[in-house]
Curated annotation (Swiss-Prot):
ATP binds at G10, L11, E12, G13, A14, G15, K16, T17. This is Thymidylate kinase. The lineage of its organism: Bacteria, Pseudomonadati, Pseudomonadota, Gammaproteobacteria, Enterobacterales. InterPro entries: P-loop_NTPase, Thymidylate_kin-like_dom, Thymidylate_kin_CS, Thymidylate_kinase. GO terms for cellular component: cytosol. Phosphorylation of dTMP to form dTDP in both de novo and salvage pathways of dTTP synthesis.
Amino acid sequence: MNSKFIVIEGLEGAGKTTARDTVVATLRAQGINDIVFTREPGGTPLAEKLRDLIKQGIDGEVLTDKAEVLMLYAARVQLVENVIKPALARGSWVVGDRHDLSSQAYQGGGRGIDINLMTSLRDTVLGEFRPDLTLYLDLPPVIGLARARARGELDRIEQESLAFFERTRERYLELAATDSSIKTIDASQPLEQVSESISQVLKQWLTSRETA
């Protein structure tokens, strides 16, 4: 089977790390072992520096919403062009912790940045490049934030209000409802059930690719 780009999405505390482990185990059970992992923002030296600025800020300077989204897209295009596309070209599968859907949901939904600007940024920076499959881990923000807080110190974005994450989730769900490549997983279930749901969805998707 040709190499594919699979992305895991969701709010803070949705369980993306566990989901990644499930995706990898499922792929390997199907004989797919050449797997590259990415995270966004990040994944290249420049993108990691931008990640630190986005997550932590610098010297107390207010990071404007538009500056934030432009930094995210700068980090993203570095990762796509320098890591993801070359990996796919040489036959590796890529499993990503977040991609463009995060910006559409967090900045477009949570921050309220104009949807036309968000679409224009995506199309200008990424062109037609899209993930082959996105697994969106959906859960109420109040649950996700409680999990995130239990992990320890929160970053700049994790400290946003509950209303911010409600808007972000709403945009995630809107986008998932209109894109068949986005599969929604109920991440409020017990962990074992979430992993089973992910594995089933991925197996079905792999089977559909083989018979297409």
